Each structure stands twice: as C-alpha cells, then as structure tokens.
Curated annotation (Swiss-Prot):
GO terms for biological process: methionine biosynthetic process. Its EC number is 2.3.1.46. NCBIfam families: PRK05368.1-3. Transfers a succinyl group from succinyl-CoA to L-homoserine, forming succinyl-L-homoserine. It comes from Bradyrhizobium japonicum. GO terms for cellular component: cytoplasm. This is Homoserine O-succinyltransferase. Keywords: Acyltransferase, Amino-acid biosynthesis, Cytoplasm, Methionine biosynthesis, Transferase. It is found in: Cytoplasm. It catalyses: L-homoserine + succinyl-CoA = O-succinyl-L-homoserine + CoA.
Amino acid sequence: MTLLFDGDRRIKSPALAPAGGDRRARDPIELTIGLVNNMPDSALKATDVQIARLLQQAAPWHVRIRLHCFSLPSIARSPMASSHVAQTYTDIDRLDGLDIDGLIVTGAEPVAARLRDESYWPDLAAIVDWARTNTKTTIWSCLAAHAAVLHLDDIERQRLASKCSGVFDCVKVRDDWLTHGIDAPLQVPHSRLNAVNEPLLAERGYDILTRSAEVGVDIFARTMPSRFVFFQGHPEYDALSLQREYMRDIARYLAGQREDYPRPPRSYFSAESEAVLNTFEIRARARRDPTLAAELPGLTLRPDLAAGHAAKLLFRNWIGYLADG
C-alpha cells in the first residue's frame, strides 16, 4: 500500500506486500478517500496522522490509498492551523471532481447549544447531502454523526448530565460487513457531551451495529444509497488521546475557563494513576491556580487497554468494502 496526500506527496510507502506468488494474486486497487477534518486546531494535525496511520495499517498490500484532506471554510482557524490547511489540504470546492470512493467526516468542538446554530452547519449539511449519492460509504464521527442524523431525519441529540469519557466494552448487536469477524467486545473510546436516542434511531430505519451496556449505542448505519456509518465513539483515537483531552480540561478548570472539575475518563487510567489524580484534584480545588497545570503528574493507563484494536478491525472491513467495487 502507498498512502498519499493530494499531489502525490507521500506520507509513507511501507513494504506491506507478502512475499512470493501472493504479491501477484490480485491486481492493484487504488481507492480515493476524503477526510473532512473538523477537529479544533489543537487536534487538527494529530487527527490527520491518526487517520493516515490507521488507513495504512488497515489496508491490505494490494490496495493503494490516495487520501485527500479537507477543512470546512466556516470553521475558524488560527494562523498556524490555517497555514497547515493551506499547505497540505485540498480545497473543499474540489470535492465534487475527485471521484471519492469513501469519506470520513470528523466531529468538531461544540460551541452553540444547538447544532443548527453552529457557524459550520450549512457547510456540514451540504456535505451530508453530497455524500448520499457521491460515495460508496461515509463514516460520520461523534458530533458529525449527530449532525448527520439531525439533518437527515430531524433526530435531535440529547445533552448528557455529565461528559461521557472513557473506554467502554461495545458488543456486536447484528451481523454486518463492517463488524465481520468481530466476536469479542470492542474497547472503544468515547468522549462526548451528547447522545442520540437509540429507540428513535431504530424507528427511523437505522441499523444498530454495536452498543455498550454503560453508554448505549456505539455504531449505527443506514443505506442512503451510500452506506452511512455513524460512530458515537472515537475508535480512531490513539492510546493517549483521552489523556490529552483530560489534561486540557484540567488546565481549563485551573484557568477559570470552566466551573466544574472534570471527571477522569472511565476504565482508562491504571489504579495507581487514578489515586494520583484524586490527590491532585484535592490540591486543584483548594488552590485554583493555572501554574498548577505544570505540576500534573505522569500517568499510566490500565495494563489491559487494547488501544487501536477496534479501529483496525473496523477500518479493515471498511476498506475491504470499498475495494470490493
């Protein structure tokens, strides 16, 4: 597999082909995949890398992927992030002329209470309409999943009492090409303030593919005729993504940018680190000082955390579906 950015600028060209006759067993297949990256500036480059690496790891040797990254113009960017977009991204106006096979649309940091009030809502809704008939399959992640079902079927997300953050065991509910070969529960990171109603999704014709007893529906899908796949979680997150988000939220609390002290991600840190974080929380509540952020302790994750395993399985099946024509 050769993984490319627009303009044939290679990220990596790994030697993944098996030796001997297996290399000639199938003709090479080239797929064009688009990534609409709506993540905030602090996570913009990390998301590029996560998705690129994930596609590289999931694709079989005979599949060559050309990855085009896009950013919605209605999402405000800092000068540094804008420069990154200008240098490495494809103009969103070119989307219609690139013959995209599959699309991945990320979430975004929520600003408005209602999705339809977000500055980028018209652009995101237009992407939903375009993807319905111009892709074979599209992945909608987190906030993008909530936005898509709102636009398609007027299904409103519901605000949670507290942030859903952690790694949760998600079990397969029904057979589907996306969940082929998945028997054991998947460890899936979730990080969200909202949720969609599972019975309402089923009533409107969505297939529930995986769910968690703790946090409800995880992956659901619907044929539009493009096969739309919706992630409420973040299987693409690397091992430290939730830790970075948690450290950011603590820093915001210490700086007075949020009133409540953030809860640590569930089923994520080791028992020793959870004890350290409890002690730090007591200090932070007693002395709310931004300089304390520099004293955040080193942390370790739970030893049985299978970081990235769920994403590799899901994206392997997703790429296989695209490659089958």
